[in-house]
Amino acid sequence: MKFLDEAKVYIRSGDGGAGSVSFRREKFIEFGGPDGGDGGRGGDVWVEAVNGLNTLIDFRYQQHFKATIGTHGMGRNRTGANGSDVTLKVPVGTQIFEEDRETMICDLTEEGQRYCLAHGGNGGFGNAHFKTSVNQAPDWANPGLPGEEKTIWLRLKLIADAGLVGLPNAGKSTFLASVTRARPKIANYPFTTLHPNLGVATVDEREFILADIPGLIEGAHEGVGIGDRFLGHVERTRVLLHLVSAQEEKVGKAYKTVKHELEAYGNELTDKPEIVALSQIDVLDEAELKKKTKELAKACGRTPFQISAVTGRGMTEVLRALRDIIVQENAEEKPAKAPKLRHRDMIVSEENNQGEDGADDQP
């Protein structure tokens, strides 16, 4: 499946139906009075986070979503039918932005979260609504209110427990393939990985999700290479695994290059816990390995792990270190404050939404 992490979408909710101008007509009833019903409410446009998706590719082929209009009211005080809602199914981790691409509307981080992006117009009142003691036969009704329309941006930030970062050919995809069932493209040339890959790793019967993103090079924050846009996919991780290839001539410089790009990107990536590992050590003899390990330790300020996806050396130790930090970060996580919502805007989970489907159906 092709990967797409950003999409532009046009949405429009349904217009409300017009109220009816009608009078009761029955035999032997000379002045039946008004009986025009109200118009139906237009359909809403919703967005919902669902499992089983990890790309926005569907929105490349369909960019327009319109809810149906409410039907007009009818005589005998019959209210028009409400318009049908439209729901955009998106992956968990999708953010919705206004057309300026900066104003966030909502952030869907859990399965089943829903948000109303555009409310349908209310139906107009029929002439029966306007009957008073001084006007027994009003001959007017309200038109339905128009729906809302807007252009929005969908931006996907994958949700994973740990993120892999490093220069191109640092062995990130090889690491992912060796500890999970993911099958990313692996080759001996830079930028083999062109989009993020996810995999589930298991150590000591504990599972966690790893995210592999394309490699960073010097100047990535300025658009060099394929830029740093994919760093958004490791913003939500608990810990970063920074891989430095043992084949680099200067491993200390390689580490600092990636670290500088993380700092330039911002969004508190450098504040995340970090595990540093010297990868692809199977290509070195012991003397060279000792030398490069010492150089990398000096650059990062800690003793790096030594790993090889080919021989399996050090792999379990790294996974356990990742697991321990993830468990600790999850235990220390503070509940997020509920966002301030506008009138009638809702973010609800699927279980809280049961039995409330008709709550907003009144005109």
Swiss-Prot record:
It comes from Rhizobium etli (strain ATCC 51251 / DSM 11541 / JCM 21823 / NBRC 15573 / CFN 42). GTP binds at residues 166-173, 191-195, 212-215, 279-282, 308-310. Its cofactor is Mg(2+). Mg(2+) binds at S173, T193. Its main location: cytoplasm. Residues 1-159 form the Obg domain. This is GTPase Obg. The gene is obg. Monomer. Its EC number is 3.6.5.-. Belongs to the TRAFAC class OBG-HflX-like GTPase superfamily. OBG GTPase family.
